[in-house]
Amino acid sequence: MNTSFENRAKLACLYAGGVWGLFWIPLRALEEAGINGLWVTFVYFLVPTIFLIPVGIWRLKYLKLGGFNLQLTGMLSGGALMLYATSIVYTDVVRAMLLFYLTPVWGTILGRLFLNENITPLRIISMIIAIIGMLTIFGLGVKFPIPQNVGDWMGVASGLMWAVASLRIRLNQNASAIDMALGFFF
């Protein structure tokens, strides 16, 4: 791999990590502006949806060719993102993020079940630590460790849904990235 490509890849990862880490700030700003509940998520995703309408029209032929598989994958990934965004509104940001980031646990299990991937001892240890972390968030030792509010449930569901969407993306690698991204919104 050449250095220029590696540097661009590193910058892309840095940028994506920064955007993902700051994702919650506009959601909370909308909430502080007086927009409540699901309306926060609706308004948050309305702007990119409006900007993507011309791209969706331009790619309509390819979206139709992708058929139900592409549409289902798009609905799952878009639904996961919507659940995640809404979970931030209904629970603490840290709880929402940590519960969403159980995605590797669900992804490992799905990879084993549907792709026959091996689960290494290191992966098992990391999954156990992640589950212990989740149980701690839910109050292990203080009360029965279950999600405490609708935002917690949405955080867990968003991570699970994202893992299913990621599995579908791996199974349908012939779809273009732009069509997959459009599936988030349409």
Please provide the spans of the model-predicted regions.
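Glycine-/small-residue-enriched transmembrane alpha-helix faces in small-molecule transporters
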Residues: 1-39, 128, 132-135, 144-171, ...
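Hydrophobic/small/kink-forming positions within alpha-helical transmembrane segments
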Residues: 21, 25, 53, 74, ...
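Membrane-interface helix-boundary motifs at transmembrane edges
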Residues: 59-68, 112-122, 167-180
